[in-house]
């Protein structure tokens, strides 16, 4: 139950922030929908590996293989903090560990193009399950 409350707090904080940002421009329903989508992306990243594409700030398209699951990140790359979110999640920003670049990267939610696949891991010894995720719309 406490995890559900924390999840709802994160979503409401995100929606409140997004309400006054472009492209929501005051549309609370749109901001809430986007906040739920951001939470879904973060859950995918916490559960295993995610293959996705987004537009970089310079306009280039970037395809990435990322995670925030501590079991899949090298021990030297895990931030030394007491926060459960690795690293601290900022409003409107999705942070992930890039397995191709061996480093932490981030992108703004509105630049996400698509999620190609999600591989989830229940424990380090299990075989991953794969889910084609498709578009978020």
Predicted stretch roles:
Residues 2-23, 31, 35:
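Amphipathic alpha-helical segments in structured regions that serve as interaction surfaces
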Residues 25-40, 65, 69-82:
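Charged, amphipathic alpha-helical segments
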Residues 46-54:
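A short, Trp-centered hydrophobic/proline-enriched beta-strand micro-motif
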Residues 63-65, 106:
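A sequence-level detector of short linear motifs
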Residues 68-103:
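Acidic, aromatic-enriched beta-alpha/helix-loop junctions
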Residues 85-87, 129-137:
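Nucleic-acid endonuclease domains
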Residues 93, 97-130:
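Short, compact, well-ordered microdomains
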């Amino acid at each position: 139950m406490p995890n559900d409350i924390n999840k709802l707090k994160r979503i409401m904080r995100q929606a409140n922030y997004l309400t006054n940002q472009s492209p929501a421009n005051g549309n609370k329903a749109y901001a809430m929908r986007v906040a739920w989508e951001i939470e879904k992306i973060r859950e995918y990243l916490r559960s295993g590996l995610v293959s996705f594409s987004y537009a970089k700030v310079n306009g280039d398209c970037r395809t990435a293989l990322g995670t925030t699951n501590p079991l899949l990140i090298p021990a030297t790359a895990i931030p030394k903090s007491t926060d459960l979110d690795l690293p601290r999640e900022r409003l409107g920003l999705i942070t992930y560990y890039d397995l191709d670049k061996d480093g932490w990267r981030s992108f703004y939610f509105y630049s996400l193009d698509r999620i190609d696949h999600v591989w989830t891991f229940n424990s380090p010894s299990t075989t991953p399950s794969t889910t084609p995720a498709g578009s978020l719309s």
